[in-house]
Design a protein with these regions (language model features):
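Alpha-helical transmembrane segments
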Residues: 2-6, 11-39
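Basic-flanked hydrophobic alpha-helices used for secretion and membrane insertion
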Residues: 24-181
């Protein structure tokens, strides 16, 4: 009887130590990934773009700003949020293919690509324009790709993120209203 109790206590202790060790590894990995890929320190949204004067007031305080507009496109039952490829903050990390899109190319969040069976070289139509998938990966701000901050679960069947060149973004914007972030 005491031997069984001893083994039960030892097993529970082993499980607790394993869970704590795994959690620490995940936290350190997330922190290191954020540092390597220039994860943002904060984010705010505005209803209209900031004026040059407002930007100057903010940057004088030592803050680096990056405009990060996006547009949501409905592709069947899912929504794809498209951003202009980033240069300084929240950089795209490729697990397959390119880290920087060229003209006519799109980079996709890896779970969205997987759920929609999209791979390198596939064509994806967004906003009436065809794009070739040339990169699949993630960004530190979309480790968990929530469509809204109030979402409680990630569903890559319903929401994903893509990145295109500045020219392609402007062409898409001509037919859509951007969200200011």
């Amino acid at each position: 009887r005491y031997l069984a109790l001893f083994f039960l206590v030892a097993l529970v202790m082993y499980m607790v130590v394993a869970i704590v060790g795994a959690a620490e590894t995940i936290m350190q990995g997330t922190k290191e990934s954020g540092r390597l890929h220039h994860r943002e320190d904060g984010q705010f949204g505005v209803f209209v773009p900031l004026t040059d004067g407002e930007i100057a007031q903010i940057t004088e305080k030592g803050v680096t700003l990056q405009r990060d507009f996006s547009m949501d496109f409905h592709l069947g039952q899912s929504t794809l949020r498209v951003y202009q490829a980033r240069e300084n903050v929240d950089l795209f990390v490729s697990s397959q293919g390119s880290e920087v899109p060229a003209q006519g190319e799109i980079l996709l969040e890896q779970h969205y690509a997987e759920k929609h069976e999209l791979g390198l070289g596939d064509t994806l139509t967004v906003g009436g324009r065809d794009f070739t998938v040339t990169g699949i990966g993630s960004t530190p701000d979309y480790d968990a790709a929530y469509e809204k901050t109030s979402d409680t679960t990630v569903d890559s069947n319903l929401f994903g993120v893509g990145f295109v060149t500045a020219q392609n973004y402007e062409a898409l914007k001509a037919g859509s209203a951007p969200r200011y972030a």
